[in-house]
Amino acid sequence: MAEKQQAVAEFYDNSTGAWEVFFGDHLHDGFYDPGTTATIAGSRAAVVRMIDEALRFANISDDPAKKPKTMLDVGCGIGGTCLHVAKKYGIQCKGITISSEQVKCAQGFAEEQGLEKKVSFDVGDALDMPYKDGTFDLVFTIQCIEHIQDKEKFIREMVRVAAPGAPIVIVSYAHRNLSPSEGSLKPEEKKVLKKICDNIVLSWVCSSADYVRWLTPLPVEDIKAADWTQNITPFYPLLMKEAFTWKGFTSLLMKGGWSAIKVVLAVRMMAKAADDGVLKFVAVTCRKSK
């Protein structure tokens, strides 16, 4: 395992338990109406809504004859997306993550919810997944690709394991799209993004235009992208408020150590970068060609 991948695995092995108060069995941001005041009581509904909005964006059908029969969640965290989709559609879901601790947690949640026959989880490398070509009717990833250095290979691997006609969904942090006259981000923008990435073990962030560019030569169709930045920013004040109470700070420190505290410190930078228009949160989807 490459050094960077090992660092990501250790980060999640050590800090996963710190975030359950905010996310439950999910490890991704929530989806809010712009301008909403986020609350702890509503955070669980918001993270589930993020999944549903992504599925809706990808035009996943509720029709029993058209809905997918199998799903792969790449970078599955502690299993929340698989568990939700398995319950929502009654289908078989598989998750893959680089963290053995996350697999252990995910399997525990599956057993608690009586879904151990519907979902399963593997420890593995997203750049070299142990699945045959064309295996899954839906391939999904949320807030995972940011950790990956070779994002283009990650996308090729998602397309490889998708069945013909399968929707492919990418939800992630990104940077703003460049204007036609720009060759790169401004130096000060790069500096801010590097600080954010270093604090939360992200490799780097690309733009939604990069995702579209990498997908275009592959055997996919109906590529589209959306900017959901305004739908996640309501969560930033909530996390900072709760994390900097004595109870919140000590809980994060005890359950997640310094890794968890660094994430909270990064959130302050993320909020400002989003306000400045540098940091984005995007959804990209397409379908594997038949």
Swiss-Prot record:
What are the start and end residues of every segment in region (SAM motif III)?
161-170
One GO process term, biological-process aspect: vindoline biosynthetic process
The subcellular location is: Vacuole membrane
Write out the tissue specificity statement of the associated record. Answer: Accumulates in tissues actively synthesizing monoterpenoid indole alkaloids (MIAs) (at protein level). Mainly expressed in young leaves and, to a lower extent, in roots and stems.
Region labeled SAM motif I — which residues?
71-80
Query: Which cellular component appears as one GO term in the record?
Result: plant-type vacuole membrane
Entry's pH dependence statement: Optimum pH is 7.5.
On subunit structure and binding partners, the annotation says:
Homodimer.
Q: Which family does it belong to?
A: Belongs to the class I-like SAM-binding methyltransferase superfamily. gTMT family.
What is the recorded name of this protein? Picrinine-N-methytransferase
Gene name of this polypeptide: PiNMT
